[in-house]
């Protein structure tokens, strides 16, 4: 989204180089607003369920593309709580974070992905965001083609080499 006016004073925004990065700044005298455009944190869950890895296909994605469960953090929510909440909301499963896998910049969407491994249990029931799920073994995961989801591939690779 490209803003045109200052959210503080409604003055026009202009581009200015700050610390060698082009930023939108308010051109109204005395305002001083800078749109820093910080990346949005997103959590991703590599879900271990019934001795296998659970992959999910978002309802808006093509048929063959499966990935991890992902979602945004709520205000004042820790990433660990957010990832367990997303697993509950999207899959109806209780989960426990087993470990932090890593952080991954998703430059195209201005997001930072915080990936966690979770152990899940309960009765699987998807919500409206998930079109379908599949369970695969760790051996299958090692050779699974996540293209074009390069970040999912990186997260899985890092989890496998833990």
Question: Over which residues does each language-model region extend?
Answer:
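Conserved hydrophobic/aromatic beta-strand scaffold that supports enzyme active sites
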Residues: 5, 25, 46, 55, ...
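Conserved Nudix-box catalytic region and its N-terminal flanking loop in Nudix hydrolases
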Residues: 48-89
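Short acidic/glycine-enriched loop/turn segments that link adjacent beta-strands
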Residues: 20, 62, 107-111
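Acidic, metal-coordinating catalytic segment for phosphate/diphosphate chemistry
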Residues: 2-44
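A short coil-to-beta-strand element that immediately follows conserved catalytic motifs
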Residues: 16-17, 93-102
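Active-site-adjacent beta-strand/loop module that shapes the phosphate/pyrophosphate-binding cleft
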Residues: 104-126, 134, 138
């Amino acid at each position: 989204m490209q803003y045109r006016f200052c959210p503080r004073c409604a003055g026009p925004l202009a581009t200015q180089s700050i610390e060698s990065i082009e930023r939108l700044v308010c051109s109204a005298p005395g305002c001083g607003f800078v749109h820093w455009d910080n990346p949005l944190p997103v959590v991703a869950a590599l879900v271990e369920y019934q001795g296998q890895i659970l992959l999910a296909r978002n309802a808006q994605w093509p048929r063959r593309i499966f990935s991890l469960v992902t979602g945004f953090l709520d205000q004042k929510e820790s990433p660990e709580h957010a990832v367990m909440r997303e697993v509950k909301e999207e899959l109806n499963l209780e989960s426990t974070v087993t470990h932090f896998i890593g952080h991954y910049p998703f430059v195209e969407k201005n997001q930072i992905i915080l990936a966690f491994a979770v152990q899940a249990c309960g009765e699987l029931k998807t919500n409206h965001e998930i079109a379908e799920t599949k369970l695969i073994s760790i051996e299958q995961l090692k050779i699974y083609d996540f293209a074009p989801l390069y970040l999912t591939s990186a997260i899985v690779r890092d989890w496998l080499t833990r």
